[in-house]
Amino acid sequence: MAAGSTEDAGRPLVIALVVDTAGNEGNGTSNSALQYAKELRRQGHTVRLVGIGSPEYPIRVRHIPLVSWIAAKQQMQFAQPDRAMFRKAFEGADVVHVYLPFKYGRMAVRTAHEMGIPATAGFHLQPENVLYSAGPLRYIPGASAFIYWLFNRMLYRHIWHIHTPSHMIAAQLRAHGYRQRLHVISNGYSPRFTAKQQREPGSPSPRPFRIVASGRLASEKDHVTLIRAVALSRHAEDIELTICGTGPLQHELRRMAGKLLPGRWSIGFHDNAQMPELLRSCDLLVHPSIVDIESLSVLEGMASGLVPVIARSTQSAAGQFALNDHSLFEAQDPAMLAQRIDWWIDHPDELSRWGAIYAEHTREEYSIASCVRKFVAMEREAIADFDGRL
């Protein structure tokens, strides 16, 4: 379809999704891209997934000294820009959507524009996350503002339509001078995550009481606070804690859990295919993260019928999911989190009632089908707006 044309406005689109790692469901950004690709196809669109691990448009890994080693601990790889592969993947496409602002994504946008194809981009990498991975650099005044500026300079200034997964990150972009058209669209959750059967009214609190958390085992996800809170709980001996993820703090968290927790615990990687069953087997979801653009793991837990207890942090959008005060605690406050955990254990009927409420709310507001329809509307708007200039 010609740029700016409104002809065949409702026809299926050919969309190229450009993501560094396209075959890794353990990485949040890749997981989102794979979910969107699957749902786009289900809705009748043609998707060309371009990236490392893609079966149709595979890209080689780009090795950056030290940086790649650190990124690998977060299940993240950098893709090597490949103009020839981009031209092959983009031929006949209606629009190109890029997920990350690195050299690979920049070349994808440049190639698309050279071919007369509009490009959009998602803002999935929070600068605060980058700084937490960089250790003491996060304490440098103005460091996060510089990264917001740098990302805009690197990629987003060449893009008019930007997908932001939450209102929080959209507000951050506005505060840091982004003047583009921002589309707040949740990443959504897979329909594989269905609600568990809640316990009958009057049933006692389960023993063991299973608490689950999911996320990278890194400092900004603050699983340290969760472990300390479980240790402080009046029901500590009855709690079974599962933390799903991999990352640089895995060994440290295991040592801490072994020292502090009297009950059973498990910390480590869980295959994405096993997550729906695991979540339905648990009783409470805790999300202690300090930094989050949205948090897919909270959506998946709520869709599974779990009540969430979420850290309230100015750098995290996850708190938006809380429907009552008992689902919130102040970030990095293990005593307050322990109180929240104890309240839910002491009120099993409320736990069941709110579990059903959270499941229904999530199904209505955050289904992948509705999110992808909004995404397609953004892409159609970008196609109509495109004037062929870089």
Language model features: what each stretch is:
Residues 90, 269-270, 277-282:
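Short alpha-helical donor nucleotide-sugar binding micro-motif in glycosyltransferases
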Residues 168, 188:
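Carbohydrate-associated surface elements
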Residues 16, 202-232, 242:
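Conserved donor-binding/catalytic core segment of Leloir-type glycosyltransferases
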Residues 307-311:
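Short hydrophobic beta-strand element within catalytic cores of glycosyltransferases
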Residues 251-273:
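Nucleotide-activated donor-binding/catalytic signature segment of Leloir-type glycosyltransferases, i.e.
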Residues 323-335, 343-348:
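Conserved acidic donor-binding segment of nucleotide-sugar-dependent glycosyltransferases
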Residues 101, 290:
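Aromatic "clamp/platform" in nucleotide-sugar-dependent glycosyltransferases that forms part
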Residues 114, 126, 143-161, 176:
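Membrane-proximal helix-turn-helix segments that form the acceptor-binding/catalytic region
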